[in-house]
Design a protein with these regions (language model features):
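Residue-level recognition of short, well-ordered coil/turn positions
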Residues: 15-16, 94
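A solvent-exposed, acidic/Ser-Thr-rich amphipathic alpha-helical stretch
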Residues: 16-65
Length: 115
C-alpha cells in the first residue's frame, strides 16, 4: 500500500494524524476548482478536517506508476455526492505534491439541457 492509499484510508476514518503522516511536511497540494494551494501538509489536512460532514468516502480506483499515483474517489457529504480525481507524486515514500479536482454530481447540469 502506498502513501496515497494510506492517505485516503485515513481521510475515510477521519484519522487526521495518520493522514498527515502520508505527506511531506512541505507537500504542495492544489485544488484548482477552488483556487486553493496548500503549501504545507498541516494546511491541507486542516482543510479536510474543517470541512467535515462526510458520511462515506469510497476510493474506487488507485493507479500507480513509479512515483506517480492517481486516485478516483466518491464522497457522500451532507446529502450531496462529490467526485474526486487526484494525481500525486511520491518522494521517499511520502506525498510530495498533488492536484485534487472535486465536482458535485450534477453541478453543471446535463449537456442535453443546455441547448
Amino acid at each position: 500500500m502506498n502513501a496515497v492509499e494510506r492517505l485516503w484510508r485515513a481521510i475515510r476514518k477521519e484519522d487526521w494524524p495518520a493522514a498527515q503522516a502520508q505527506l511531506h511536511e512541505h507537500a504542495v497540494i492544489r485544488w484548482p476548482h477552488t483556487d486553493d494551494r496548500f503549501d504545507r501538509a498541516i494546511d491541507y489536512i486542516t482543510a479536510h478536517r474543517l470541512h467535515g460532514g462526510r458520511t462515506r468516502v469510497d476510493v474506487r480506483r488507485v493507479i500507480s506508476e513509479g512515483k506517480h499515483v492517481s486516485v478516483y474517489a466518491v464522497i457522500d457529504d451532507a446529502g450531496e455526492v462529490w467526485y474526486c480525481g487526484g494525481i500525486y507524486e511520491l518522494q521517499d515514500g511520502h506525498i510530495a505534491s498533488g492536484t485534487e479536482i472535486y465536482t458535485r454530481e450534477g453541478a453543471l447540469g446535463r449537456i442535453a439541457d443546455r441547448r
